[in-house]
Amino acid sequence: IEGRVPFVNFFDGFRTSHEIQKVAVWDYDDLKEMCDMDAVAAFRKHALNPERPNMRGSHENGDIFFQHREACNPYYDALPDVVEKYMGKVNEKLGTNYQLFNYYGAPDAERVIIAMGSICNVAEEVIDYMTAHGEKVGMVKVHLYRPFRADKLLSAIPATCKKIAVLDRTKEPGSQGEPLYMDVVTALANAGKTDIAVIGGRYGLGSKDTPPASVFAVYDELNKAEMKRQFTIGIVDDVTHLSLEEKPAPGVAAEGTIECKFWGLGGDGTVGANKNSIKIIGDHTDKYVQAYFQYDSKKTGGVTVSHLRFGDKPIKSSYYINKADFVACHVPSYITKGFPI
């Protein structure tokens, strides 16, 4: 409202929208304190109203259209500072540390991932494991993508960084690289930081699972003398051979997290029962909970897999369970048909 620029708050489609998590919800009174009511009044004043008639969206010729398009520049230039101001207010209230770009990892990291979206939680688990074993790795999380503030990105990258892998959850065929990768390369080039090697990768298209093994593979690639400039993770690309080799990964979930996996048949009630179970645990205990349900578009009659986690610590594991503490198979024929139960 204060910035007077339209916003799109986006997240990783199915992976995030269909996940059940315990979250903290703000009270409306707290939200009201965050809102600049003068800015709200100014916003409403510009709404279509018969008491204040105005004409918009009719026709504009080429003699003035370009000038009008450039006239909005000051609003976009000021927007990152407005966002940062409100992030500061949130941090003050909740004790968080939201920035336009947040760094996570070793303070002297030499290998850094830059990404946004669900892979950031997976990367945090991997970074915790690797730094505990003496590795100098880290990650920059992007919270405000547009307008892109290059100076804030550069200040978030450790001075010791030598190599960067940028991960995009999109594919732009025919381009030199995906959008975030191109933004990072441009920001570094404009700042004269040509000594940092940058590679770009794709992950998670169509909610493809991105397990810790994929993130380990990215850091392994950054350790090589000859790196793939463009790569994919989470799949085996036997056509263009862009995928990175992924090795079995150690368990990196928070200590004490219980992981349960349920195999079922679409329409047999397995998914519904598990949704109720995880909600009961979340509503009536102090446990952190997470549930994600894997099924195809056929739904009824197809294979379903329910992934349930709960524990005493926040759960960052935005990927399928591959080392379950408990497994249930509600369709006996799955066992003899080669499913990886």
Regions found by a protein language model. Give the residues of each.
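Conformationally flexible catalytic loops at phosphate/diphosphate-handling active centers
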Residues: 4-102
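Peripheral docking tails and interdomain loops at the edges
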Residues: 163-252
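Glycine-/acidic-rich phosphate or pyrophosphate-binding loops and their flanking alpha/beta elements
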Residues: 88-111, 124, 243-257
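Glycine-rich beta-alpha junction loops
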Residues: 11-18, 117, 171, 203-207, ...
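Hydrophobic alpha-helical bundle architecture
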Residues: 140-160, 167-168, 309-322, 326-341
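Short acidic, glycine/serine/threonine-rich loops at helix termini
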Residues: 12, 18-25, 124-126, 151-152, ...
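Structural signature of the thiamine diphosphate
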Residues: 1-42, 207-247, 327, 341
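Anionic-ligand anchoring segments at beta-strand to alpha-helix junctions in alpha/beta enzyme folds, i.e.
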Residues: 107-108, 112-143, 256-323, 327
